[in-house]
Amino acid sequence: MEFRQLRYFVAAAEEGNVGAAARRLHISQPPVTRQIHALEQHLGVLLFERSARGVQLTPAGAAFLEDARRMLELGRTSVDRSRAASRGEIGQLDIGYLGTAIYQTVPALLHAFTQAVPGATLSLALMPKVRQIEALRAGTIHLGVGRFYPQEPGITVEHLHYERLYIAAGSSIARQLRQDPTLLRLKSESLVLFPKEGRPSFADEVIALMRRAGVEPRVTAIVEDVNAALGLVAAGAGVTLVPASVAAIRRPFVRTMEMADASDKVPVSLTYLTDSRVPVLRAFLDVARRGKGQK
């Protein structure tokens, strides 16, 4: 059974005449007649009662007509969906993320993408960078979002944008630092860094930044994540450095101030298989790059 046979049958049923159906289909009558006969032979039933005035559906034909219409509609829908999928307009994108990217970057990306490609679906999973790389290779995620990815063969790391650094300190320490929020001033402060796992990391970058400025950091704790670091800061256990997206969120007993002498910025990056041909990933990257150009 072919879609062509279904189209010819539906046209003949709706017109009540094979000749009229042929004119509607912009073909000659004999092919329509042959294909309807072939369809009847395939089904093993008569679909039409034929007369000099035209054709009339048999009970079997009337029952088959509704199914034929549904099959034709399904065929059209399937073609449309397959073409949309090839353009990345539908399909599921699986994303792994880590750390402070969830505060502004990930929500902004997801909002922009769902506005541009409403037919796509998204899934998010919190996972360390090492697991993101493993998941990319295994095909269980299409994209990772985070910072300071290691160089890996077959993996592309694309910097999306850069954020300035802020000092985060408890209320009493912040009052002292506010007049001189510099790396040099932090030389005498206890420093809480994050994260503990996943080298290279934000903690490594902060240490390197301070050493480039001639300051040997007094690291008193390296904790699991930014929330743990800010918890210690709020308790007066030290200070930490955070990206601008974290500084923008108000927290009890924590004050933030932009670094006065640090021009360095930290990247937010996307990572994916270099040779990926997943259309919905390509569509997502196009949206992300357009947004990058607007920053």
Swiss-Prot record:
GO CC field: cytoplasm; protein-DNA complex
Main location: cytoplasm
Keywords: Activator, Aromatic hydrocarbons catabolism, Cytoplasm, DNA-binding, Plasmid, Repressor, Transcription, Transcription regulation
Subcellular localization: Cytoplasm
PROSITE patterns membership: HTH_LYSR (PS50931)
InterPro entries referenced in this protein's UniProt entry, alphabetically: LysR_subst-bd, Tscrpt_reg_HTH_LysR, WH-like_DNA-bd_sf, WH_DNA-bd_sf
GO function terms (MF aspect): DNA binding; DNA-binding transcription factor activity
Origin: domain of life: Bacteria
Keyword Transcription in annotation: yes
Residues annotated to bind DNA: 18-37
The keyword Chloroplast appears for this protein: no
HTH lysR-type domain location: 1-58
Record-level GO BP terms: catabolic process
Functional summary from the UniProt entry: Involved in the regulation of 3-chlorocatechol degradation. Transcriptional regulator of tfdB expression. Acts as a repressor in the absence of its effector (either 2-cis-chlorodiene lactone or chloromaleylacetate) but acts as an activator when its effector is present.
Similarity comment: family membership: Belongs to the LysR transcriptional regulatory family.
This protein's name: HTH-type transcriptional regulator TdfR
Originating organism: Cupriavidus pinatubonensis (strain JMP 134 / LMG 1197)
Gene symbol of the encoding locus: tfdR
